[in-house]
Amino acid sequence: QSAIADCSTQDLERSFRINLYAHQWLASAAVSVLRAQGMGGFLLFNASKAAWNPGAEFGPYAIPKAALVALMKQYALEYGALGIGSAAANADRIRTQLLDAAELQARARARGLSSDAYYRANLLAREVTADDVAEAFLHLALAPSTTGSVVTVDGGNIAASPR
């Protein structure tokens, strides 16, 4: 976490390795297998609301996540003719280890919320769980006529919805 102009090259490269390149490495290997099998398949990418609505001092995370959406679309474009689909889930405010307790409290406090209310601060007033995101991935993987799309799983956050 840092303002983008203050972010070290090392920290930015680390974020790109985790949030973009890891997806590229895995997708490339998967396409090799799927091409060899000749049966099509589906690639799933873990996007983030930060691609559409980055936060202050979250550029090192948001920038590779925005590039990840372009990567997913590139796979859809280049491998759709082989029956290989590609899509992403765009989740927000899922309880993960990304934020430690102090960071979570600071984000919640900045919005006038408790830590628990922070996770329910969406149009549905409902906490979005990892299971919700898994269901979205399953839906995408089983949608035979869908490729190049993003499904948002955030309980409703208009500022972070793809435009």
What are these regions (language model features)?
Residues 32, 77-78:
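Alpha-helical segment proximal to the catalytic Tyr-Lys
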Residues 5-24, 44, 68, 119, ...:
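Catalytic Tyr-X3-Lys loop
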Residues 27, 64, 72:
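Active-site helix of classical SDR
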Residues 126-153, 158:
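C-terminal substrate-recognition "lid" of short-chain dehydrogenase/reductases
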Residues 1-13, 57-60, 113:
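Conserved mid-core segment of classical short-chain dehydrogenase/reductases
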Residues 80, 85, 145-149:
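Short, small/polar-rich loop/turn modules that mediate ligand/substrate recognition or access, typified
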Residues 48:
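Residue(s) in the substrate-gating loop at a strand-loop-helix junction
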Residues 81, 94-121, 163:
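A glycine/serine/threonine-rich, flexible loop-to-helix segment
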